[in-house]
């Protein structure tokens, strides 16, 4: 569990991790959990994905976000969908995950509408590759 103390409201928040974080990941979360914006500059393999997902879950639990956009390199973005999200987001958080693809099918269009729709109390996660921004 991570206990965070907000200096503005002196509220203690509790978050139950799905996967146990290392100390440096806890330290990063303590620095970013209540910020409007932040960046994670860390070496490859240090758990930036876990930090980002845990932070998104903390914000979701606090009612600060209801959607998450993940932009990753083409060779890595499907790893978020196939492995990382289910590995790190706690099971008690209901979520809807959609990966970007170049498709005109009616089913995919309906899924896109769902991701963009009003909040139905699920964390909506849209994952895309950075190269798609240039197409």
Question: What are the roles of these predicted feature ranges?
Answer:
Residues 2-40, 46-135:
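SF2 helicase/translocase NTPase motor core
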């Amino acid at each position: 569990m991570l206990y965070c103390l907000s200096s503005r409201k002196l509220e203690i928040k509790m978050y139950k991790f799905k996967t146990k974080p290392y100390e440096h990941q806890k330290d990063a979360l303590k620095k970013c959990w209540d910020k409007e914006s932040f960046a994670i500059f860390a070496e490859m393999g240090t758990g930036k994905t876990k930090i980002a997902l845990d932070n998104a879950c903390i914000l979701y639990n606090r009612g600060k976000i209801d959607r998450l956009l993940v932009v990753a390199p083409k060779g890595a973005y499907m790893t978020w969908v196939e492995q990382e999200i289910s590995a790190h987001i706690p099971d008690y958080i209901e979520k809807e995950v959609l990966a970007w693809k170049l498709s005109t099918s009616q089913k995919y269009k309906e899924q896109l509408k769902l991701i963009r729709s009003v909040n139905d109390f699920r964390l909506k996660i849209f994952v895309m590759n950075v190269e798609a921004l240039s197409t």
